Amino acid sequence: MATKPQDANTTSREAITSKADSPPRPTALIFDSGVGGLSVYQEIRQLLPDLHYIYAFDNVAFPYGEKSGEFIVERVLEIVTAVQQRHPLAIVVIACNTASTVSLPALRERFAFPVVGVVPAIKPAVRLTRNGVVGLLATRATVHASYTLDLIARFATDCKIELLGSSELVEVAETKLHGGVVPLEVLKKILHPWLSMREPPDTIVLGCTHFPLLTEELAQVLPEGTRMVDSGAAIARRTAWLISSQENVISSQDENIAYCMALDEDTDALLPVLQSYGFPKLQKLPI
């Protein structure tokens, strides 16, 4: 088996909870096209458990992996603006590799608060590989992004980088979080280009925030000893540093909240999952 990673008016669905008294704390927005960003949120919450967290996901335009860069930039700006109009944001984390590779410059130009993005953990993977073959598992948009190719050119000149783009795997991760079973045969089919290699990658970069949610299943399919790395812990450390560096941050006593772009049967089913992550309320975000 492979080893696991190392390092306004709104309609709402609410849990019946009582507000516990809590000290004021800065507000952090975690955004993803789907629920994969919860893997990044987990890492951040471990370091910063007392922040006021908002999780927003774009279940109308999901998945972003097949969308144009122009569409993604406009969409992310629209959503972050809508949240910012309702909450005093101290920091925004774009917990989506695809969105990060295209939208960060526009976000940083528009907003005064820091914006953190997620990029493939190619540099640490290069340090870990033993056979000199590193696999990048991401959406097709991330695999072909100029930012990704630049990372490879800067940090992986002495390694062979095998690229594998899959939007299907994103759907599989979403299915798992909704309570579905992950068929290993589906994973084997997706990973076949690597599994059929004479010398497959011994280190895999999980280049989509959805994929750490599947590490248990991926470990059953990948060759024994394969390492998987993602950038979640590094993003958490960066977020903690940026929060600690701010002065006169507006704090909130509100409870954590999740926003989606449309309420439907799928979001109804997702509410218990969000509650387990510490988000008692799920509301539609008017944009």
Swiss-Prot record:
Species of origin: Yersinia pestis
Name assigned to this protein: Glutamate racemase
Location of the active site: C96, C208
Signal peptide limits: none
One Pfam family hit: Asp_Glu_race
Lineage: Bacteria, Pseudomonadati, Pseudomonadota, Gammaproteobacteria, Enterobacterales
GO biological process: cell wall organization; peptidoglycan biosynthetic process; regulation of cell shape
Summary of the function given for this chain in its UniProt record: Provides the (R)-glutamate required for cell wall biosynthesis.
Reactions accelerated catalytically: L-glutamate = D-glutamate
